[in-house]
């Protein structure tokens, strides 16, 4: 059995961070438990030491929360305004990074020996974009490049901004990549052995394939849609994941309630294989199982997780179940 964790909104039925068991022999989810009460813990990250870091809030202030390996609250680091929307761990420097969508900020925090966090530095973006959701900067992602630079996706300004980070966590802007106007870059992932990155754009529901030079510079190579050609509804792309072998890429569509499956060719470019329904509403996140045999998608608005069997040879997905209850889930990860 594998432990699988869920970050959630707590606007309706959810009370915080949940854990369930996943059986890799059968693909079944079971035994949902509330492990930590926290308002709107919408994104989660674990350190190798087992500490859990979450989007957090306390007494009307927003920020980040840290929890012990047995899910006990260690501390909050909060400020006026909205909490973060993304958190990630830098094991080498002993830092945690956060993205704040509403404030247009990227932040760094020091991890102390007992797992508690202290604020180190922040950078505030400037600018806007042509889409109605781009009136101001909206930093949606902050994580490491393969060469340990900090990379951020700003949905509000159509920019990917790269930072140098010193050993103490101080941020220095290094490079900026500009996407197509109104694209709304949300998350980015890097191929394990090609010099390519895959940028998912929320507002125009596309994936940009980018050459990456290892120094923070990107060059556009391909743009491909996450939706069927004849689809005329809302464009609202969300999560993006690579298979461990680097042969396949997956992306979720929130309004279309689907997952797009792509083959990765030898030059790093993408070919669409299929778009499969997730049998839920608003599949904001999904994850591949550690053995790569399954894909689990979670739904914010229908309170269910869908399990797909994954063909490792073809990359294609076959639904196994869609009736496991998880309230308001918007983040899923194994630990």
Report the location of each language-model feature.
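Short loop/turn segments immediately following the C-termini of beta-strands
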Residues: 9-11, 57-59, 101-103, 111, ...
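A short beta-strand motif characteristic of beta-propeller blades
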Residues: 30-36, 72-78, 121, 127-132, ...
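Blade-loop segments of beta-propeller domains
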Residues: 31-93
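Short loop/turn segments immediately following beta-strands, especially the blade-tip
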Residues: 21-27, 67-70, 109-118, 164-170, ...
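Loop-centered beta-sheet repeat module
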Residues: 150-205
């Amino acid at each position: 059995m594998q432990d699988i964790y869920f970050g959630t909104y707590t606007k309706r039925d959810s009370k915080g961070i949940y854990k369930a068991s996943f059986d890799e022999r059968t693909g079944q989810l079971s035994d949902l438990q509330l492990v930590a009460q926290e308002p709107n813990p919408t994104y989660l990250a674990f350190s190798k030491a087992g500490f859990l870091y979450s989007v957090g809030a306390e007494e009307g202030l927003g920020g980040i929360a840290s929890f012990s390996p047995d899910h006990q609250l260690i501390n909050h680091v909060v400020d006026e305004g909205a909490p973060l929307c993304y958190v990630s761990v830098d094991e080498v420097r002993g830092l945690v990074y956060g993205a704040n969508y509403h404030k247009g900020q990227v932040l760094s925090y020091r991890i102390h020996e007992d797992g508690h966090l202290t604020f180190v530095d922040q950078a505030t973006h400037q600018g806007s974009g042509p889409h109605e959701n781009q009136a101001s900067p909206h930093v949606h992602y902050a994580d490491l490049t393969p060469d340990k630079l900090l990379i951020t996706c700003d949905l509000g300004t159509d920019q990917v901004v790269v930072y140098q980070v010193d050993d103490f966590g101080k941020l220095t802007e290094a490079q900026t990549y500009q996407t197509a106007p109104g694209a709304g870059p949300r998350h980015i992932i890097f191929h394990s052995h090609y010099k390519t990155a895959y940028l998912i754009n929320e507002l125009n529901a596309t994936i940009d394939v980018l050459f990456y030079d290892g120094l923070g510079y990107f060059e556009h190579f391909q743009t491909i849609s996450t939706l069927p050609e004849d689809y005329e509804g809302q464009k609202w792309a969300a999560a993006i994941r690579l298979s461990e072998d680097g042969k396949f890429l997956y992306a979720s569509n929130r309004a279309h309630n689907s997952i797009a499956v792509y083959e990765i060719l030898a030059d790093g470019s993408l070919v669409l294989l299929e778009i499969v329904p997730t049998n839920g509403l608003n599949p904001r996140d999904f994850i591949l199982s550690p053995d790569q045999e399954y894909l689990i998608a979670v739904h914010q608005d229908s309170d269910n997780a869908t399990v797909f069997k994954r063909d490792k040879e073809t990359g294609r997905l076959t639904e196994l179940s869609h009736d496991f209850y998880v309230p308001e889930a918007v983040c899923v990860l194994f630990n």
